[in-house]
From Swiss-Prot:
Start and end residues of each UVR domain: 624-659
Protein name: UvrABC system protein B
Domain Helicase ATP-binding, chain residue ranges per copy: 24-182
Job description of the protein: The UvrABC repair system catalyzes the recognition and processing of DNA lesions. A damage recognition complex composed of 2 UvrA and 2 UvrB subunits scans DNA for abnormalities. Upon binding of the UvrA(2)B(2) complex to a putative damaged site, the DNA wraps around one UvrB monomer. DNA wrap is dependent on ATP binding by UvrB and probably causes local melting of the DNA helix, facilitating insertion of UvrB beta-hairpin between the DNA strands. Then UvrB probes one DNA strand for the presence of a lesion.
Domain Helicase C-terminal: 427-593
Subunit structure: Forms a heterotetramer with UvrA during the search for lesions. Interacts with UvrC in an incision complex.
Main location: cytoplasm
Source organism of this protein record: Chloroflexus aggregans (strain MD-66 / DSM 9485)
Amino acid sequence: MPFRIEAPYQPTGDQPQAIEKLVAGLRAGYRHQTLLGATGTGKTFVMAHIFAQIQRPTLVLAHNKTLVSQLWAEFREFLPDAAVEMFISYYDEYTPEAYVPSKDLYIEKEASINEEIDRLRHAATQALLTRRDVLIVASVSAIFGLGSPHDYGQEKIHLRTGEVRNRDKLLRQLIDLQFERNDVDFQRGTFRVRGDTLDIIPANAETAIRVEFWGDEIERIVELDPLTGEVLLKHTAVEIYPAKHFVTTKEKLQLAIVSIQAELNERLQELEAAGKLLEAQRLKQRTLYDLEMLSEVGYCSGIENYSRHLDGRAPGQTPWTLLDYFPDDFLMFIDESHITIPQLRGMYNGDRQRKQTLVDYGFRLPSALDNRPLKFEEFEQHVYQVIYVSATPGPYEREKSEQIVEQIIRPTGLLDPEIEVRPTRGQIDDLLGEIRRRVERKQRVLVTTLTKRMAEDLADYLKEMGVRTMYLHADIDTIERVEILRDLRLGVYDVVVGINLLREGLDLPEVSLVAILDADKEGYLRSETSLIQIIGRAARHIEGKVIMYADTITRSMEVAIRETQRRREIQMAHNVRHGITPQGIAKGVRDLTDRIRKVAEERGEYVTTPETAVPVDLPRDEVLKLIKDLEKQMKQAAKALAFEKAAALRDQIVELRQALALSE
């Protein structure tokens, strides 16, 4: 019985044959297949159908957090009964530990962990250990070191009503699982004790588990809202998984401490023999402090650097990653594989180079080198069956694939966009005229440039000309980037200018024009693959058009234009043959940040005070600044447990965004 797909439409266009061929390939035992799908042909829908028919745990790898968020939201809609989870880096801000010998500069690791994303990571790993109908959408974080799935799964605590359980012993078990006791600031990964009642917020949950004792007997287990205390569900049994992925047994911890001490002694001898006395002293001081922390509390800052000892692995042995939480027969999709595959290849070398310097200068033991991402060869060994998904598959996918399935026809009958090449002379004025024509028709525009400076200058110029413009650049964090793209769709902005951020996987049906500046400058950003991907951003609109500003036609431009024309002719012939009239895509604007940034599910009965009321006469730029300021205040209020204030601020933000979206 296939898993249930929920969608207001059935597979059409090229989708049915793509699903049929790829499923047949999987059942025939093909290890490598490629879905060559043009932009807007519904590749995500096809992936959901394949998952539903194959009925195996599935990993969808994507190359950035924005795309992961988008895919996760779509799969959750298509597969309401399945466990659709997300696994990305939980750092909002991250500066890795590093040492620059030329400046004698040590950079300490600084990280700001996003609690909500950490919760989603735990939800993903726990789903994999408890059920089969699991689809995880992940970034390359999937190949970075994670705690052992065996320890994570075996160390869980089973609680059942009616069983006799020594409460004090249970509290010690929770502490062993890295839970913290906190009777005041009750949050995820903590527990509190009140009389005969024990409350726990598991690492994967937003709700609390209350365990009520009668003496040493568990009398009742309920799930409740930690803020209001409202009982949501009654349970006969629950399982509490560790609060952190890096967890180990007491026996393994003791063995690890002995092993770390032995490695330290050996390394100190090496450094002293080489006359590196400063490095030896530094390493000794840092490692002994960590060992003391491990002995006393079972945890230390940077514990992941000792993961080889904690896991009992041999030097150089493959580390545990998210891939090890999957069963052997799992299915993998690699979305936008032409970008994701090279990214997977490059992870190991960059990490190794940075850590080798730390080891050489006595900041870390050599075993820290084994806290690393997978080498590409190790990643390949984890693959049971994989489907590469891309509009422009790379040489690796083409060479490996036993079958390449084309998906060119769109269900809506939409054609690939028309392409026009225009001279660079007077390009900005020409572009401004095109933008104004699109704005009159309530359409959106993407503009891609080659340099950050040019993108900034162009965005500033367009703003001066009265165009609602936003500049999308690499310094913008994940959540804000998602919000900018959402606001483009809502009409807060009419134009978004970017460099390399307007390519793979951006689903923006309102965009009718993509302008490519300096299209004839050969290079990575203007290769045939990049150009085809950029062109695809205009393929979801019935009036989709691409303007390349160039003075010559490069080979990459020629290939991209020819391939787009080939697909366009196939699509036109299909439409004529079946009497299809192209239709625009009507797609709701999902709030991809709904579970990553929120204070409460429902709007509360909160009153906005006159001092904080929304000003209606501010210029648009000032309102956008105000929204940012209010969001900061909302976060601070939520952190300080001032939930009424946080919810009131949230309501103001919603009102401001609605006002911006409606105003012209």
